[in-house]
Swiss-Prot record:
It comes from Helicobacter acinonychis (strain Sheeba). PROSITE patterns: ABC_TRANSPORTER_1, ABC_TRANSPORTER_2, METN. This is Methionine import ATP-binding protein MetN. PANTHER family: AMINO ACID IMPORT ATP-BINDING PROTEIN, METHIONINE IMPORT ATP-BINDING PROTEIN METN. It is found in: Cell inner membrane. It catalyses: L-methionine(out) + ATP + H2O = L-methionine(in) + ADP + phosphate + H(+); D-methionine(out) + ATP + H2O = D-methionine(in) + ADP + phosphate + H(+). Belongs to the ABC transporter superfamily. Methionine importer (TC 3.A.1.24) family. Keywords: Amino-acid transport, ATP-binding, Cell inner membrane, Cell membrane, Membrane, Nucleotide-binding, Translocase, Transport. Its EC number is 7.4.2.11. Residues 3-239 form the ABC transporter domain. GO terms for cellular component: plasma membrane.
Amino acid sequence: MVVELKNIEKIYENGFHALKGVDLELKKGDILGVIGYSGAGKSTLIRLINCLERPSSGEVLVNGVNLLQLKPKELQKARQKIGMIFQHFNLLSAKNVFENVAFALEIAQWEKNKIKSRVHELLELVGLEDKMHFYPKQLSGGQKQRVAIARSLANYPNLLLCDEATSALDSKTTHSILTLLRDIQKKLDLSVVFITHEIEVVKELCNQMCVISNGKIVERGLVEEIFANPKHAVTKELIGIKNEHADKKSQNVYRIVFLGEHLDEPIISNLIRRFKIDVSIISGNIEELTTKDIGYLVVRFLGSIAETQRALEYLNALGLQVEKLKD
């Protein structure tokens, strides 16, 4: 495991209980989206991973090492394998792009003759070779975040922490940054933890997700599995799933989930032909995820109880997830 958090508790001096019994694992090569509403404990969680915050109790293991047991110099060395980017970039305004990236190498005591080539390599990676002499005030928000990404990768980390890294960006720039992160993750075989309150970020970037609410992890798993079958009320809210009805008198209303391989199949028309049943479509949409697409249909079955039951058994036999909505 690249990251293991074991039974983490975090209680601040004012008595606020930010994290409660948190257990979390991150495997090599995974991109984990940690999502929740403001105040849920997301930023506290990510700052514990590199010990910018220390837990009240529990264990923090990164690359198999318990960071809480390290001496200051040992912790500083361990942090070199953990990159981090922030919402507001945290660039040094008095230094240009080259110097901002080089600063991380200087702190790590790189030899001067190696710093120049490494900075050029990093700026090429993030597409800013032509901006190395620019200062932060001359850059757009997306360019500033690219500098921050380059700086975070300076010391060849195998873990990248992203704390609301796209929250200050518009949607077009967010997409370009997420595309860059996805490409870099593949190229460098990074493990990534991305804190966000935006479900679109999870959909576009992550293969794993965890939902945090009131200091607890309430749901954790593959992105497509959670989107297909969310369990917790907060997860359903974040994904945007509602109990949809045509009216209060509606009966036999179901939500059907179609995973990628079923999206192009005429399942509903086949069902109508096969059984003595009509199907009224109330709503539908498709979620485009990193790993696969997922389709949702909310429908009402119009037919006898026996034929409706046969239709449901048919859908289940195809491997579709079917949920009856409340009458």
